[in-house]
């Protein structure tokens, strides 16, 4: 399981919707220490925990140093966010690769090298810049979100995917959308405009709705 910010009851209900047996979950990976990602750590204390960020529990792993978890090869990729040790994860199994990367203000050249021609991408498309600037949020918060230690906008997400997606890529999911400074349709349209040659599935993860993927 990746992060645990929602209530345990909510998470278990969503697992049921996906026909996932919660008893089959044997580890918890944490991306960073913001409360919306770690609030339920105690509720899942029976699981071994892996993180780059400093926690009171679990195993501390290092960016770009792969480790094995059962049949998964997992590589943490350092993210640029206002939380120590924030990361995304690259998962590899039976020749297929999946990237999960949200909560980052930009994507480094090092990460781009790791992200080339993957089978699956789950990438942040957090905000539309104009919508963000037109919100009633304090300017300091807008600046934080827009900064290199904030979140990826739709345009940057599209540019990154245009650089990375290749012939192996079959599914792209846009994630971590702001409800106030973005819309699913806007995120989809902007990113789609950059993926001129991409023929696979492009979908948007809505908040509080189950999104499933995987073509096999």
Region roles according to the model:
Residues 1-18, 85-103, 120:
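Conserved beta-strand hairpin/beta-sheet module of binuclear metal-dependent hydrolase folds
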Residues 4-6, 33, 79-82, 102-106, ...:
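Active-site metal-binding loops of divalent metal-dependent hydrolases
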Residues 7-52, 119:
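Active-site metal-binding motif and surrounding structural segment of the metallo-beta-lactamase
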Residues 15-19, 65-71, 111-114, 162, ...:
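Short amphipathic alpha-helix with an adjacent loop that forms part of the alpha/beta core around
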Residues 24-27, 96-98, 120, 171:
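Structural motif
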Residues 27, 59-62, 200-209:
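Beta-strand->loop->alpha-helix junctions that form or flank phosphate-binding loops
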Residues 48-96:
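Metallo-beta-lactamase
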Residues 109-206:
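Cap/insert and terminal regions of metallo-dependent hydrolase folds
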């Amino acid at each position: 399981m990746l992060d645990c910010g929602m209530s345990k009851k909510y998470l278990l209900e969503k697992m049921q919707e996906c026909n996932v047996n919660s008893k089959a979950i044997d580890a918890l990976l944490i991306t960073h220490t913001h409360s919306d990602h770690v609030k339920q750590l105690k509720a899942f204390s029976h699981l071994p925990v892996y993180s780059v960020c400093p926690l009171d529990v679990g195993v501390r792993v290092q960016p770009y140093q792969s480790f094995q978890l059962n049949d998964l090869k997992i590589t943490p990729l350092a993210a640029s966010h206002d939380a120590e040790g924030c990361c995304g994860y690259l998962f590899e199994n039976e020749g297929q690769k999946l990237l999960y990367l949200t909560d980052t203000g930009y994507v480094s050249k090092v990460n781009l090298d790791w992200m080339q021609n993957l089978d699956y991408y789950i990438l942040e498309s957090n905000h539309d810049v104009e919508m963000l600037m037109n919100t009633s949020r304090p300017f300091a918060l807008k600046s934080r979100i827009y900064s290199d230690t904030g979140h990826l906008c739709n345009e940057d997400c599209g540019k990154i995917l245009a650089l990375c997606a290749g012939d192996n890529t079959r599914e792209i999911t846009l994630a971590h959308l702001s409800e106030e400074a973005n819309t699913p349709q806007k995120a989809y349209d902007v990113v789609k405009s950059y993926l001129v040659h991409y023929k696979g599935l492009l979908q948007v993860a809505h908040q509080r709705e189950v999104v499933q993927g995987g073509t096999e």
